Amino acid sequence: MPRNQRIAFVTGANKGIGFEVSRQLVREGFRVFLGSRNAEAGRAAARKLNREWKDQESVFFLEIDIAEQESIQRAAAEFARQSNRLDVLINNAGILLDDDKDILTTTPEIFEGTLRTNTLGALLVSQAFLPFLRKSDAPRIVNVSSGGGQLTDGADGWAPGYCISKTALNGVTVQLAAALPDFSVNSVCPGWVRTDMGGANATRSVAEGASGIVWLAADAPQSETGKFWRDRKVIPW
């Protein structure tokens, strides 16, 4: 690996937005660690991208379940065996469990599970990979959030656990940005994207959804931090 090659780790990257983000980062010249809790799917995704680029050294699979602390620690230990530096962490993995619930009918199990993955998971991964990020000349953390987490637009009652978890993730972003002044730490809304989560009627392709994430990871000014973005513009939350 060239010394100046940037290194990224993308969680939830075996399909959907995370897979496309990984693809676009390879195109930008990154070495990518592709995270997935499903080992078979993750390895297949990494092989697919390496075949696309005819380069077996571009994408590496890293097994991780961000809802499990032990899995996060194992992933960090495995990463350390392959690299001592990380330039960009993209906390993309997330779940949607309550799109058929409202705030009056959601259950403790759904609510706690959603927050554990979408909010706490992103924080714990950031903490675990912080030693590697500190070795970068320009470390970045990108948290994939959602317009559903915007309080400024008012709640419409849809998927309360999911939306609240994304509001809280934006809060984590602000806290991390304050604690890590030499880092660029941002949240981003990819828009309504045609994925398993977004559904077939969504208005954006995965390539369009990934674009803003990749921009924050690769090209946005390092001085931009603690903000919430969509389409390369800061939005309120």
Stretches found by the model and what they are:
Residues 2-33:
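Canonical Rossmann dinucleotide-binding motif of NAD(H)/NADP(H)-dependent dehydrogenases/reductases
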Residues 28-44:
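Conserved glycine-rich Rossmann-like NAD(P)H-binding loop of the short-chain dehydrogenase/reductase
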Residues 39, 62-75:
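The beta1-alpha1 cofactor-binding region of Rossmann-like NAD(H)/NADP(H)-dependent oxidoreductases
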Residues 55-58, 78-91, 97-99:
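A glycine-rich helix->loop->beta "capping" turn
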Residues 90, 125-129, 133, 172-173, ...:
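Hydrophobic positions on the long internal alpha-helix
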Residues 95-115, 123, 134-181:
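Catalytic loop of short-chain dehydrogenase/reductase
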Residues 167, 182-183, 187-193, 199-237:
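C-terminal helical subdomain
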